């Protein structure tokens, strides 16, 4: 095509993801196209399993485990409260988490059990810094959810997942499935508790660090469930956990690729190829040791979608940030210091810098290039920001937050790189070196301005008096602070754009006060100035200020040139 671009063109739609999420939430509230129902404390939560699976690793495992998962459309769970599940569902569909002093503990516990890293991190930080302090927030207030209630809920969640993961065709007795009836023998539960306790102790002691929890091959290479589980004390339910327990949430990896009918959609037995689904699971398997432990309080996700985290975090970030700013105005200095740490934490977390610690390395390889060109919309001014991690920095322009403080002079900055440059004033560091004269500078722009001393470049010119300047701020000061009287300077440079003023006849000489026309199309710089200055210098020293205006440091800088052409700083 003549005059066109040959090749694909990527056209981003920044509002597309939020529009899709809004549409799904509207369907949920109206009960449209919901393919699964979650029962908690007698309440029904119709929802879309794809949305829950994208937000929660636990629901993803639950909805893609078992041979009859396509026919399972009702799940009754008792290890989370209805109020906590309501808040988490609203978070999944609206990207906004609503917490209060009364429910922050329940939401934290539910987020840990359901493996929602973003929510668990934020709630844990709120409790740790006592931003939402309560008299009694339950066992969730203990470090890493180590309370007895959380341990019981963790056990129940694990049993429920194992019940659906186990293949009902392996001829196991009904007592092997604790969730098939609440009357399971105590011996099985004791063995379960011992296995969990051993795994927890191994993680706490650091014995699991570096082990290959997933074996030498991907999940697709492992035998299906039931091929050799009959010899265990709890067949098909609890494999060996002392050495093979994965650190990411104490949940085992998938033991087999999904069946051909296991497509995760209600009421549809798809005929997809097993190889494609096995390859998808193989890509979703985390690298050994990349996922932090469930009880460590870190995120438990194994294959979290980093791009979705950025999209979900914007409104939550703004809500928490504005709350912290409001509290900072009424608190003392120490409290404001703590609030600064909270703000810093949120900005770093939602900027994407945390993903190297939360998500395994495999999820970054294919997303780094995409994230570098990501578009995000500011929730305040709706300006589209290009570049991953730049949205939190832009939001600071609205909130006035300056999270980075100099520990010497207490000056605060909005960006960490600005603080790093500021610290050079205290340390005396001057990393930028002139290759011609050896002068050192603390700032890159100072070196750039200094190099104009050697090159003679003065790119900034006053349109009224034709005076030229090395730096733009000097020209601005000349126009605003000093005031330009419009009289051409005796030592001003030649006009770089306008040429001879239009009121001067062609062929006539330059009017008094204006410099002569350039010779051979070249402008005069330091050499001509030195000759003029030597004639006018009262002491005959031959030294001049290359600023172009005697005693006006705004027209040049600290550089000085001698009559012999040697420059010094």
Curated annotation (Swiss-Prot):
InterPro entries reported in the protein's UniProt record: BTB/POZ_dom, SKP1/BTB/POZ_sf, Znf_C2H2_sf, Znf_C2H2_type, ZnFinger_BTB_dom_contain
Region Mediates interaction with SMAD4, annotated ranges: 371-569
Gene: Zbtb7a
UniProt keyword annotation of Nucleotidyltransferase present: no
GO terms, biological process: B cell differentiation; cartilage development; chromatin organization; chromatin remodeling; DNA-templated transcription; double-strand break repair via classical nonhomologous end joining; erythrocyte maturation; fat cell differentiation
Residues that bear Phosphoserine: 331, 335, 537
Zn finger residue spans: C2H2-type: 376-398, 404-426, 432-454, 460-484
Ranges where the record places region Disordered: 214-304, 480-569
Post-translational modification summary for this protein: Sumoylated. Undergoes sumoylation with SUMO1 that may regulate its transcriptional activity.
Subunit structure: Homodimer. Interacts with BCL6. Interacts with RELA; involved in the control by RELA of the accessibility of target gene promoters. Interacts with AR (via NR LBD domain); the interaction is direct and androgen-dependent. Interacts with NCOR1. Interacts with NCOR2. Interacts with SMAD4; the interaction is direct and stimulated by TGFB1. Interacts with HDAC1. Interacts with SP1; ZBTB7A prevents the binding to GC-rich motifs in promoters and represses the transcriptional activity of SP1. Interacts with the DNA-dependent protein kinase complex/DNA-PKc.
Gene3D superfamilies on file: Classic Zinc Finger, Potassium Channel Kv1.1, Chain A
GO cellular component, one term: nucleus
Positions with biased composition (Gly residues): 548-557
Pfam hit, one: BTB
Biased composition annotated in UniProt, kind: Low complexity: 279-288, 498-519
Cross-link entry Glycyl lysine isopeptide (Lys-Gly) (interchain with G-Cter in SUMO2), positions: 430, 527
UniProt protein name: Zinc finger and BTB domain-containing protein 7A
Compartments in which it is found: Nucleus
Record key words, sorted: Developmental protein, Differentiation, DNA damage, DNA repair, DNA-binding, Isopeptide bond, Metal-binding, Nucleus, Phosphoprotein, Repeat, Repressor, Transcription, Transcription regulation, Ubl conjugation, Zinc, Zinc-finger
PANTHER family: AGAP004733-PA (PTHR46105), ZINC FINGER AND BTB DOMAIN-CONTAINING PROTEIN 7A (PTHR46105:SF6)
Region ranges (Mediates interaction with KHDRBS1): 275-569
């Amino acid at each position: 095509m003549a005059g066109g671009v040959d090749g694909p063109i990527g056209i981003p739609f920044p509002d597309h993801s939020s529009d899709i999420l809004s549409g799904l939430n509207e369907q949920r509230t109206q009960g449209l196209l919901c393919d699964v129902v979650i029962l908690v404390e007698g309440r029904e939560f119709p929802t879309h399993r794809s949305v829950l699976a994208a937000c929660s690793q636990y629901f993803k495992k639950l909805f893609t485990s078992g041979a009859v998962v396509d026919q399972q459309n009702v799940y009754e769970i008792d290890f989370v409260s209805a109020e906590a599940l309501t808040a988490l569902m609203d978070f999944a569909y609206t990207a906004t988490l609503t917490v209060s002093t009364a429910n922050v503990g329940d939401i934290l516990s539910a987020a840990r059990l359901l493996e929602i890293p973003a929510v668990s991190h934020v709630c844990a930080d709120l409790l740790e810094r006592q931003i939402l302090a309560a008299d009694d927030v339950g066992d969730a207030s203990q470090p890493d959810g180590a309370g007895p209630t959380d341990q019981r809920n963790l056990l129940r969640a694990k049993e429920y997942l194992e019940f659906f993961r186990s293949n009902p065709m392996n001829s196991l007795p009904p007592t092997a499935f604790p969730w098939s009836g609440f009357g399971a023998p105590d011996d099985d539960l004791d063995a379960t508790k011992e296995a969990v306790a051993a795994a927890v102790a191994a993680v706490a002691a650091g014995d699991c660090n570096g082990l290959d929890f997933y074996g030498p091959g991907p999940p697709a290479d492992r035998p299906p469930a039931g091929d050799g589980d009959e010899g265990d004390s709890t067949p098909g339910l609890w494999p060996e956990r002392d050495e093979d327990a994965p650190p990411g949430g104490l949940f085992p990896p998938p033991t087999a690729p999904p069946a051909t009918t296991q497509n995760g959609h209600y009421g549809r037995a798809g005929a997809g190829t097993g190889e494609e689904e096995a390859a998808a699971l193989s890509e979703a398997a985390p690298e050994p040791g990349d996922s932090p432990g469930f009880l460590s309080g870190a995120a438990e996700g194994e294959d979290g979608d980093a791009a979705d985290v950025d999209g979900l975090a914007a409104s939550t970030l703004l809500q928490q940030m504005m709350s912290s700013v409001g509290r900072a105005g009424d608190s003392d200095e120490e409290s404001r210091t703590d609030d600064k740490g909270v703000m810093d934490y949120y900005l770093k977390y939602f900027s994407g810098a945390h993903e190297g610690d939360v998500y395994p390395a495999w999820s970054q390889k294919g997303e780094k290039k995409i994230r570098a060109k990501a578009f995000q919309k500011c929730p305040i001014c709706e300006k589209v920001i290009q570049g991953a991690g730049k949205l939190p920095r832009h939001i600071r322009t609205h909130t006035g937050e300056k999270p980075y403080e100099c520990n010497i002079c207490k000056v605060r900055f909005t960006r960490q790189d600005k603080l790093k440059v500021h610290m050079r004033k205290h340390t005396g560091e001057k990393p930028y070196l002139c290759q011609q004269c050896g002068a050192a500078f603390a700032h890159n722009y100072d070196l750039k301005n200094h190099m104009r001393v050697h090159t003679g470049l003065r790119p900034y010119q006053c349109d009224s008096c034709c005076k030229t300047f090395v730096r733009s701020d000097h020209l601005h000061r000349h126009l605003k602070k000093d005031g330009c009287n419009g009289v051409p300077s005796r030592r001003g440079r030649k006009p770089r754009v306008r040429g001879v003023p239009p009121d001067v006849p062609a062929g006539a000489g330059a009017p008094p006060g204006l410099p002569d026309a350039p010779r051979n199309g070249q402008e005069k710089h330091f050499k001509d100035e030195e000759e003029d200055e030597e004639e006018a210098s009262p002491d005959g020293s031959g030294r001049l200020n290359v600023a172009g205006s005697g005693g006006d440091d705004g027209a040049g800088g600290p550089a000085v040139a001698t009559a012999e052409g040697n420059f010094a700083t």
